[in-house]
Structures are given as structure tokens and as C-alpha cells.
């Protein structure tokens, strides 16, 4: 039996060395070490041995099993290493090849402009307020001194959802909501950026959806000079320290007196050109002193409090600052346009 065990060992190790693939190794393992394998079959005959022979043959059998197992493990490891090397050779990466370009995105121009405006006014002590885009008729019109059937309502071409709900035509409702929430009990210094909607036909200067940012200050002894000073700071920070402003009389139901603000043309420095239509000035926003009736409806005593308000289109500010001639460029997602304004 001793010779038979050694013969099985030699045959098994030789077969393992000649194996060509993992399946062959698995078959050899079953052939020699399995429940019906050669080694197991020989060991079943140990019952016929004497007590003295059994320990000796048992030890030899264990050694043979360990030697066959070791041969199988070594061959398996060798095959796995060869397979890995072959795979790596096929998947070799040429590190000298140029990499794929990484396209770095940037903030949209409108986002940059509104953040710049917000930072400017936050630096002057303003809070940023927000409100719903689906607004009530009351806050969009009536609370702003635009009662039902007021002719100025027609100027805003409103998207109505129901008789009392609409898509806001301006961000002024946020001001009205804030004033009524404060109920005349404390001063206000706020700006409110956001989307607004009007039934305009889209063209180079109009859009059915655009963005506004409006400001409101209410306190004691606020005058038109405070508004002018604030807008002068805004114009110089946004368009350059050499820019000048002028205020022209206008009409807005929310304010009295009302003004429109022009800034000196950046292209011609106020001398007159095609951009400013030879006037030397470009209109950028409207504003005025908060109407006493609006103050009263919001709980503020107009004999004690006064305030100013202003509003501007973010797209218009961006167009003037960066020389964009068509508002539609902001919304078509043309990468050729957008990449012109990526910051380094």
C-alpha cells in the first residue's frame, strides 16, 4: 500500500504539471482527492492492515494528500498569474497618449450678474427676500396701488391662472408681503430677485419669462436724495466709477414721485452713439418714493415713515454690462455664447 500511495502521488503531480487550464486542474483534484478519487479508494483498504501498519500508512497518506494539494495550489497560482499578465498585456495603457479634454463649466451669465447685484446691496445692509411666483391678484396689483380695472394693469399683459391667481408680473409683491408682515412696526431694507412672467412676444428685447430684482427701503426721514445716492453707488459699482446717472420724471402706481434712471453710455462716454441713440444716456431702471397709499395699506403711517423703491431687469443689466444684443441668448443654451463669459 505504501508503494501504491507513492505511485498515486507521482502520477498526480506529473498530471498537474501537464495541465493546460483551470478546468483540467479541477478535474485532477476530483480524480485524486475527491470522494471517489484514487487516494480515497486506497485509504478504504486500511481496515485490512494490522494495528502496527495503520499509523504508518495513515501518516504517508496524509503526506501524499498534502503534496498533491500543494502541487495543485502552486499550479493554480501560476495559471492565475499568467492569465493576469496576459490580460494586462492586452490592456496596456500608453501613458504618452494625450488625455481626453475636460470641459470645465462656469456660472451662467445671469447667475453671475444677480450674485454681483446681491453682494453689492448686501454690502449696503440690505436683506434678500423671496416670494411665490404664483401670486394673488391682491399682492400683485391691489396692494401696490393698482385696484381692479386700473388702466395701468393693461401695461403688464398678465398670465392669469384663475380670477384671483396669476403668474407674478413683477417682484414687487414680495415687497408688499414684507411690508404687511412687518405691519408698520419696523424699518425695511431689502431686495427681492426672481423670475417674472408677462404675455410678451419673444424678440431681441422682450421675453415671456425674465428676471427682475427690486429694492425697498422704509424708515423715518427717507428722501429722494437717498434713492439717488443708492442708485449712483449701484451704477458705479456695476458699470464703472466713471459712469454718471440722471433721473427723469415718470409714472408708476407704486411710487410718487416716480423716476426712471439713465446711466451715461459706456460706449461713447456720454458723447452720443448708435447704442444710446445719440443721447449719451441708456435707461436701466425705474423707481421712486413709495406711494403713501401703499404705506397705509401695509400698516405704515405715511406721516411717520417714508421710503423708496426701485426695480430693474437682470437681463437688461447683463446686456448693457457685457454687450449682449439679444435677450434670447440667455435662454437658448448655446455653448458658444455661454463660454464667452466663463470666469478663469
Curated annotation (Swiss-Prot):
Keywords: Aminoacyl-tRNA synthetase, ATP-binding, Cytoplasm, Ligase, Magnesium, Metal-binding, Nucleotide-binding, Protein biosynthesis. Its cofactor is Mg(2+). Its EC number is 6.1.1.20. InterPro entries: aa-tRNA-synth_II, aa-tRNA-synth_II/BPL/LPL, Phe-tRNA-synth_IIc_asu, Phe-tRNA_ligase_II_N, Phe_tRNA_ligase_alpha1_bac, Phenylalanyl-tRNA_Synthase, tRNA-bd_arm. The keyword Nucleotide-binding applies. Mg(2+) binds at residue 256. It is found in: Cytoplasm. GO terms for molecular function: ATP binding; catalytic activity, acting on a protein; magnesium ion binding; phenylalanine-tRNA ligase activity; transferase activity; tRNA binding. Pfam families: Phe_tRNA-synt_N, tRNA-synt_2d. One of its GO terms (biological process) is phenylalanyl-tRNA aminoacylation. Belongs to the class-II aminoacyl-tRNA synthetase family. Phe-tRNA synthetase alpha subunit type 1 subfamily. Tetramer of two alpha and two beta subunits. This is Phenylalanine--tRNA ligase alpha subunit. It comes from Oceanobacillus iheyensis (strain DSM 14371 / CIP 107618 / JCM 11309 / KCTC 3954 / HTE831).
Amino acid at each position: 500500500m505504501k508503494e501504491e500511495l507513492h505511485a498515486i502521488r507521482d502520477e498526480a503531480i506529473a498530471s498537474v504539471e501537464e495541465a493546460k487550464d483551470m478546468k483540467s486542474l479541477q478535474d485532477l483534484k476530483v480524480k485524486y482527492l475527491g470522494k471517489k478519487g484514487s487516494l480515497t479508494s486506497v485509504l478504504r483498504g486500511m481496515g485490512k492492515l494490522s494495528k502496527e501498519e495503520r499509523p504508518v500508512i495513515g501518516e504517508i497518506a496524509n503526506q501524499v494528500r498534502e503534496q498533491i494539494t500543494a502541487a495543485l495550489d502552486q499550479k493554480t497560482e501560476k495559471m492565475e498569474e499568467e492569465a493576469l499578465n496576459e490580460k494586462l498585456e492586452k490592456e496596456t495603457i500608453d501613458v504618452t497618449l494625450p488625455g481626453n479634454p475636460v470641459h470645465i463649466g462656469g456660472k451662467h451669465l445671469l447667475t453671475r450678474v444677480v450674485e454681483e447685484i446681491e453682494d453689492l446691496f448686501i454690502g449696503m445692509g440690505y436683506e434678500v427676500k423671496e416670494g411665490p411666483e404664483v401670486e394673488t391678484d391682491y399682492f400683485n396689483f391691489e396692494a401696490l396701488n393698482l385696484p381692479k380695472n386700473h388702466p395701468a394693469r393693461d401695461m403688464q399683459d398678465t398670465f392669469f391662472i384663475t380670477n384671483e391667481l396669476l403668474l407674478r408680473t413683477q417682484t414687487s409683491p414680495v415687497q408688499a408681503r414684507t411690508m404687511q408682515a412687518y405691519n408698520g412696526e419696523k424699518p425695511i431694507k431689502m431686495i427681492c430677485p426672481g423670475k417674472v412672467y408677462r404675455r410678451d412676444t419673444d424678440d431681441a428685447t422682450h421675453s415671456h419669462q425674465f428676471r427682475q430684482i427690486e429694492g425697498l427701503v422704509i424708515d423715518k426721514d427717507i428722501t429722494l436724495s437717498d434713492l439717488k445716492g443708492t442708485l449712483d453707488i449701484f451704477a458705479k459699482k456695476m458699470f464703472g466709477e466713471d459712469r454718471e446717472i440722471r433721473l427723469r420724471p415718470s409714472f408708476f402706481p407704486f411710487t410718487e414721485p416716480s423716476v426712471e434712471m439713465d446711466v451715461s453710455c459706456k460706449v461713447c462716454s456720454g458723447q452720443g452713439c448708435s447704442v444710446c441713440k445719440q443721447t449719451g444716456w441708456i435707461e436701466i431702471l425705474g423707481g421712486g418714493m413709495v406711494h403713501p397709499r401703499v404705506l397705509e395699506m401695509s400698516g405704515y403711517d405715511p406721516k411717520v415713515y417714508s421710503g423708496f423703491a426701485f426695480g430693474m431687469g437682470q437681463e437688461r443689466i447683463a446686456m448693457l454690462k457685457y454687450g449682449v444684443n439679444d435677450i434670447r441668448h440667455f435662454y437658448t443654451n448655446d455653448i458658444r455664447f455661454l463660454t464667452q463669459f466663463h470666469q478663469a
